[in-house]
Amino acid sequence: MAQRSGKITLYEGKHFTGRKLEVFGDCDNFQDRGFMNRVNSIRVESGAWVCFDHPDFRGQQFILEHGDYPEFFRWNGHNDHMGSCRPVGMHGEHFRIDIFEGCNFTGQCLEFVEDCPFLQSRGWAKSCVNAIKVYGDGAWVLYEEPNYRGRMYVVERGDFRSFSDWEAHSARVQSLRRVLNFF
């Protein structure tokens, strides 16, 4: 069974100031809890979290692991808008992901069990990944740019036949890493 608990505290002000919202599980709309959608700092006390810039777990994703994020640019945010969050489902510490060139698991395939800052350095011929399979226990973050930069997408155990299955705008993936979960 996936471990999906933890604690994250969201603050309206920079450096952990202003009104705050403590979350211990899925929160699909911050406004429903009386908190505006403006988040300028975050403290992750336990677990790994994926936050979204819109309610209902939609929009741009941000992965947040254990630690302090005193300003929104620390989590790759371009502004202070955030609408929902949820803990990342973790099953253990055994990581494996297969990436595929074509949709529906066709074409070139590469397996990863460790972080990879640049897929092309491992023999991946293209800048696109059209399907993935996540095995094992852990979750992964896919990045559109090398060295864990650009738009990010969190994927947990399962089959993703097309980039739209992980809510991506395009098939562009150039780096990937494991999600580390601290309790």
Swiss-Prot record:
Detected in the auditory hindbrain where it is highly expressed in the medial nucleus of the trapezoid body, but also present in other nuclei of the superior olivary complex. This is Gamma-crystallin N. Coiled coil: none annotated. Crystallins are the dominant structural components of the vertebrate eye lens. Also plays an important role for integrity and function of auditory nuclei. The gene is Crygn. Belongs to the beta/gamma-crystallin family. Monomer. The keyword Repeat applies. It comes from Rattus norvegicus. It comes from the Eukaryota.
